[in-house]
């Protein structure tokens, strides 16, 4: 009886998760696409410079004139050559400028690849990940659902292996790990290959905007002499838990960030008021200095 109930619970979750990641919970016409761009020159409009390719399929690519993005996104990181780093969820529609001979793309969600991933392999596919509810006393534990985007197919895996902690200095591993497995819309898309229960990610695509929620406003504390305001940083890169901390002895070394990343710091409670440094992707919103 208990075994059958667990099987029913797992099956129900699985069906829900496949529906969620396929985009059919929004509109049946919504699919995930990789974007490409070429700076072609045309003598007569319209002049579509973008193409989209439906993920995990062999369908023919489509030419796109314009993208219609949701409000609140920094479009300078999304258009032109930058668009080659995007995955978009949405649907095509007739162009507002040339309805009879051009196509626009109405974007529901947009994801951008983290710089300095690994070179993609011929076996890589695109996945999103969920928790299947399995709990184990030993590891590895097969508790991760890897759902193939645009395809009603999935695999159960035990490990998500990211390349970025090796490739990028001072990356916030808590921030990245929090995006691997989510129950909301804000999880990452992983391009990778599954073997023996492990997916080796070549590139991760981050949901935009990031963070997806507004950081909380913090009170301004009055600290006694010899103390200063310090913080922690949560999985959304927001400063939290302000407190007065006695000054510590700080090192003077300041790290350099890899290309595509910017240096940020904050007075850390963990480091007794000394600055804690991270290298955040340049395309995410700043949450502090």
Swiss-Prot record:
UniProt name for this protein: Uncharacterized protein DDB_G0275255
Keywords assigned: Glycoprotein, Secreted, Signal
Disulfide bonds: none
GO cellular component term, pick one: extracellular region
Signal peptide range in chain numbering: 1-23
Cell location: Secreted
Major site of localization recorded for this protein: secreted
